[in-house]
Amino acid sequence: MSETSEDEQTQLQTSDEEEDLGSEEEQEDEDNNHKEGDSEAALSGEDDKGSEDDAAEEQKLTWKDLGLNEALCQACDELKWKAPSKIQREAIPVALQGKDVIGLAETGSGKTGAFALPILHALLENPQRYFALVLTPTRELAFQIGEQFEALGSGIGIKCCVVVGGMDMVAQGLQLAKKPHIIIATPGRLVDHLENMKGFNLKAIKYLVMDEADRILNMDFEVELDKILKVLPRERRTFLFSATMTKKVKKLQRASLKDPVKVEVSNKYQTVEQLQQSYLFIPVKYKDVYLVHILNELAGNSFMIFCSTCNNTVKTALMLRALGLAAIPLHGQMSQNKRLAALNKFKAKNRSILISTDVASRGLDIPHVDVVVNFDIPTHSKDYIHRVGRTARAGRSGKAITLVSQYDIELYQRIEHLLGKQLTLYKCEEDEVMALQERVAEAQRTAKLELKDLEDTRGGHKRGGDTHDDSENFTGARKRMKPMGGTGGGGRKSFGKKNWSKGKQKR
């Protein structure tokens, strides 16, 4: 056991110089991979006919054709998974042959099913506790994967345990003591249990999955991964799934996989065809005004708005709620219970606008997002792919709008270079936008007061790591200002010009 781990640890921690090349190396990676993608597409002759052939193949193939157990085929039917997706068609047969798999696919392509179904198939053939370990970068993704395992295994008595930070360790320890079949964990909390929970080990694990592997490594979990790899048995199957293949992921592959089969069903930086991408060039001082204009123009849709900082999500949510819009924030400084509550309200359509940091840009399955707005342009161009991947999922159409200020031009050009195409300009009338300025300015002032009240009230708690409630406690703004356009809880009605003019009247 220790011999295995030393090899893995050595491979994972070699070539420090490679790690320190920084953003220039990453940009070079993007350039090279982009060129490779173009040449591969040209050589393979990918065109509309290829898409039609893929669609025809998808209609022909069934879950049974992939070699899955009948009980799992029935579970897929009950979940209304009509046919395997491209990544599932490619990865599942390879996994069922007992081979290690590297899966590269666009977000929203069904990666979870691609590793969950082979694991459950193997578990049915060889039932045992502590059968599989799934590592994920975020708590929300861990819970989502747990839900999918339980849904697929509901008819066969599968027991899962989700082990993440922000939750009670004692309760998690009790769950682990019951020896579940599947453990879904974030690396940091799993290491806590390995080091502190008497009698808990991973010596029996048959399957290791690293989902969103590039994100795990980008979040500086290398040390935790080393510790986990040290205690895993040599004889295991390993699945590595990622949206992108970086140098760090390649090193992890060498450290943890044996003769893997690479399954890649899309170009590295491809976005789905159903996604309409556009940009809007704006003065930074009127950023909030343009955002509100977009929400007004596209009223009736569900939105995910991405901000660069936790504080920005709170300020933007307060401002929108002051206008009567059903906005709810999601960021890394919220407690786990509040993060889950925010997600669940948005998924249940009780709130139509989710304002998030990049904590929610990867892996989460929120099927009804109609529009993604990049309020703050991402610093790393690859994060753009993951943000806009929240919409246009599972064959549905969607929109992505990026706000570009005078300070964001270089970052925006990197995104276009990465995509290999220019985005279209989102058309809007400046006069209509600026008609909202006074009302938005009033909402900004109200939001600023709200934020100060919250910080004053919760100053002590904030230092403890549990910041603003970010959802239901933003009531002061609504007391001071009348909501606009009767958006109510769902935010579905447009607050047109008539309502704006009413809002300007003295109260």
UniProtKB/Swiss-Prot annotation:
A motif (Q motif) lies at residues 61-89. Residues 494-507 have a biased composition (Basic residues). Residues 451-471 have a biased composition (Basic and acidic residues). Residues 426-453 form a coiled coil. A motif (DEAD box) lies at residues 211-214. Disruption phenotype: Conditional RNAi-mediated knock-down in germline cells results in hypotrophy of the nucleolus. Residues 92-263 form the Helicase ATP-binding domain. CDD domains: DEADc_DDX47 (cd17954), SF2_C_DEAD (cd18787). Residues 1-31 have a biased composition (Acidic residues). GO terms for cellular component: nucleolus; nucleus. Residues 290-434 form the Helicase C-terminal domain. Part of a translational control module, also containing ath/DHX33 and ais/DDX52, which coordinates germline stem cell differentiation with ribosome biogenesis during oogenesis. This module allows for coregulation of ribosomal proteins and non1/GTPBP4, a p53 repressor, preventing p53 stabilization, cell cycle arrest and loss of stem cell differentiation. With atos, adjusts transcription and translation of a subset of OXPHOS genes in macrophages to increase mitochondrial bioenergetics and allow tissue invasion. This is ATP-dependent RNA helicase DDX47.
